[in-house]
Amino acid sequence: MYIVGIDIAKKSHQAAIMKPDGTLVGRSFRFTNTKQGFEFLMDKLAAVDSSLENFEFGMEATGHYWLNLYTWLADNHATVHVINPLQSDALRNLYIRKTKTDSVDAKIIAQVIRIGQYSETKLADDRMLMMRDLCRQRFFLVDMVANLKRKIIVMMDRIFPEYQGFFSDTFGKSSTAILKHCTTPEEITLFGEDNLAQLLQVASNGKFGLKKAQELISLARNSFAARLSSKTLSLLVKQMMEQMELLQNQIGILEKHISSHFKSFGT
């Protein structure tokens, strides 16, 4: 049984092939963290032994860069040991006192696997990894929406300061429908009572109508808005409203997937 120690990095990995007695098979070699790099690794191993079953792989859980290589090896039914980096520190220090080359870590990892003095890092299964990635993406998108809302509020304070507070929720359905069409006092006034009333009635499911439209136009006519760059800011607000709508739709899709995957855990 051969042992392949792999020193994980972001763009490329270093590998060393070791025999059971601790001697190395040839020199250590580098391969890229790509499909082509994986194929290069397989070719290198095939030159030593044609069966992947005769190799055991060892790697440290370094960030997330090991995941791609790990999953490709696992899909090929290889035996892979993922160890905590702290477990190889003592042996690493002994080697570093003697020499320091790019291949040292790969040899150390192979040696740790050969000696067997390690405990494997508990790996998440496909469902857990999927759930983690889905939740991370959701948090990322939610943060983007929050940032857009803050920017919109700042811009609206300049072009229509009285608008905030007119609706109980500036980003509720009724207010969103308005801001997608008109944002400045001038635009709202020109849009007209009838158009505003119709827009509000549809967006609010009949809760608002002509009365609310008239109140908004009155607010617009008496606004103490900054007139500098109002057209530019209006354009930016409308674009950000569109971006926010897209992000919220994407969040909804993610939440459906998260709910579906959560049910698969049987909880």
For the regions a language model picked out, list residue spans one by one.
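A detector of single, family-specific signature residues
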Residues: 1-267
